């Protein structure tokens, strides 16, 4: 079971990816983790990554594809894998296709922008413990205060509405077109293309999980 997950930041990809990887006993392959592991291992690719990162540059798609090819040869990928955070753009998706890296399913978790803004901008955090609240869905007993310590809660920079909207804008410009790429591929060459699964990411975690798993055969 070889899977790519798509969805805007805050759509709930991480939680659902965990359900999928446990159900099918496959690893979740994060590009960030792969890059860090390659640098640590000081492999040939790792040294290239280290050089690029040290200069403040972006690691090329070619290097990331090579790392993915290397990673999916590992024994824990014998049942498949779930790609997290890649591809993000159409050129990356085309590179993955050109290298012949087979994908069985592309799973999109679809959530309206305003719902995502509400989810993320409503989060409040207790810095000392990392406890997370939500002003609407999981409020503290006393507004703005941690339940355990009574200390003030903060809103992280990443959760501020302006930041969330910027992240969504980037997602719609770069990653959302992948939906069309994979749908079009499935229409033109259904035998070769990954099967496209789209699920509304609103409702209970269990119901979203069940919708996804029912379509992954």
Curated annotation (Swiss-Prot):
Q: Which UniProt keywords apply?
A: ATP-binding, Cytoplasm, Kinase, Nucleotide biosynthesis, Nucleotide-binding, Transferase
One cellular-component annotation, GO: cytoplasm
Give the enzyme's main class according to its UniProt record, as a single word.
Answer: transferase
For region NMP, the annotated ranges are 30-59
Q: Which reaction does it catalyse?
A: AMP + ATP = 2 ADP
- What's a Gene Ontology MF term here? ATP binding
What's the chief localization of this chain?
cytoplasm
Q: Which residues bind ATP?
A: 10-15, 123, 132-133, 203
Any Gene Ontology biological process: AMP salvage
Which cysteines in this chain are paired by disulphide bridges? Answer: none
Q: Which InterPro entries match?
A: Adenyl_kin_sub, Adenylat/UMP-CMP_kin, Adenylat_kinase_CS, Adenylate_kinase_lid-dom, P-loop_NTPase
**Pfam family, any one:** ADK
Positions annotated to bind AMP? 31, 36, 57-59, 85-88, 92, 156, 167
Give the pathway listed in the UniProt entry for this protein. Answer: Purine metabolism; AMP biosynthesis via salvage pathway; AMP from ADP: step 1/1
Q: Where is this region: LID?
A: 122-159
Q: Which domain of life is it from?
A: Bacteria
Q: Where in the cell is it found?
A: Cytoplasm
Q: What is its EC number?
A: 2.7.4.3
Subunit structure comment from the entry: Monomer.
Protein family according to the UniProt entry: Belongs to the adenylate kinase family.
Its biological purpose: Catalyzes the reversible transfer of the terminal phosphate group between ATP and AMP. Plays an important role in cellular energy homeostasis and in adenine nucleotide metabolism.
The text the record gives for the protein's domains is: Consists of three domains, a large central CORE domain and two small peripheral domains, NMPbind and LID, which undergo movements during catalysis. The LID domain closes over the site of phosphoryl transfer upon ATP binding. Assembling and dissambling the active center during each catalytic cycle provides an effective means to prevent ATP hydrolysis.
What is the designated name of this protein?
A: Adenylate kinase
- Which species is this record about? Marinobacter nauticus (strain ATCC 700491 / DSM 11845 / VT8) (Marinobacter aquaeolei)
């Amino acid at each position: 079971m070889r899977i790519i997950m798509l969805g805007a930041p805050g759509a709930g990809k991480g939680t659902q990816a965990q359900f999928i990887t446990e159900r099918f006993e496959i690893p979740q392959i994060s590009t960030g983790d792969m890059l860090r592991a390659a640098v640590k291992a000081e492999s040939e690719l790792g040294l290239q990554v280290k050089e690029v990162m040290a200069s403040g540059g972006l690691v090329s798609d070619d290097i990331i594809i090579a790392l993915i090819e290397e990673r999916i040869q590992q024994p824990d990928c014998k049942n498949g894998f779930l790609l997290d955070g890649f591809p993000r753009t159409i050129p990356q998706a085309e590179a993955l296709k050109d290298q012949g890296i087979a994908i069985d399913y592309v799973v999109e978790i679809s959530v309206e922008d305003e719902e995502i803004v509400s989810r993320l901008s409503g989060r409040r955090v207790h810095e000392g413990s990392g406890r997370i609240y939500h002003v609407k869905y999981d409020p503290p007993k006393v507004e703005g205060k941690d339940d355990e310590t009574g200390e003030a809660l903060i809103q992280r920079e990443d959760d501020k509405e302006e930041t969330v909207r910027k992240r969504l804008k980037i997602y719609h410009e770069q990653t959302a077109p992948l939906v069309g790429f994979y749908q079009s591929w499935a229409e033109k060459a259904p035998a070769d293309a990954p099967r496209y699964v789209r699920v509304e990411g609103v409702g209970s975690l269990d119901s979203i999980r069940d919708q996804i798993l029912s379509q992954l055969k």
